[in-house]
């Protein structure tokens, strides 16, 4: 009972959690052990949950053009803090991985008068709609004049999820958990449409590192009270990017639900997708904090151009040539992602027998030299959330984003290596391995 009370309290307040142990996390990977883990998604899998307790729910369309190297995403974020404050945001990123100094734009815009209708989402000047056949999304956003988006995303392969219920639950009762994590995917799709961007001319020639340093300086000035507004006339460069029917971009789409405070659910994430003309590979992986025994939950997907070849959970993401950066995280300079499992055609008895004929392996590896941005998460969240999270010792969340269309390659089993475009996100949230009294300090 004490642990249940502590769990409920921490879910509301955001303080660090006690060390519950392995029995207080019920992973989706454990439930599919020894079985065929691949399940095709239905339209209902993409209905918004929108519960009345603390949660963050997102849909993200990751677009990438193999020919030009342009990569990015359009994302809707719907959040609820303690059941008292509901908000929605449209975030957008576009990055030219072959010419980073020419195009690297980020926008984040608060949504007004938003509403949910099953799988669809609406707000002023924004709509996301899934067709009745569960084969196509249409995203239109005019909420920010710097990033006007009109994209149609059409499935090339079936949707995919891990197991019948793709959720990981936190707590001592699976039927009444105090937290959860869930992901469902459309791994390989075409993306047709148009994106209009307005890029500040003074940042058009700056590298991601220079922009990050400039942002840090601005934040330091704000903290020191130097917040007097300086009137400046910003000149923009307008660009229109078109993804045509004859030369579409690829898209990886994911819907995610996190039903608890982010620093309670995970202490680190590895996320990657890779597209080539023949294949797609996806990794979504998180590791829990010490309070849930540093448990790793890993979801991998391998496709060809028409089919899901495998959904896997015996995966690894190796951080290579690591180096401690200016904020203190040990950031990799290279990554190697390996997915191992059984072909989607294998039956439960085939998986249990573990015969070689049903096994499959895929590897994506490459250098993490082309950084899109190092995102200081605490600099992006509202102040009232920041005050809650900053009270937890060892919590300093940063997301490292990388995009590369030239130096990553994919290998399926012992086949030939194929080049393609990769997007990688390495996220560090908390470093504390020991729960101490200081962890509960909210001052």
From Swiss-Prot:
Outline the segment boundaries, as ranges, of region: Peripherally associates with membranes: 1-18
What are the record keywords, sorted? Cytoplasm, Endoplasmic reticulum, Golgi apparatus, Lipid transport, Membrane, Nucleus, Transport
The main location class comes to Golgi
* GO MF term list: ceramide binding
The GO annotation for biological process reads: ER to Golgi ceramide transport; response to oxidative stress
Q: Which family does it belong to?
A: Belongs to the SVF1 family.
What is the protein name for this chain? Answer: Ceramide-binding protein SVF1
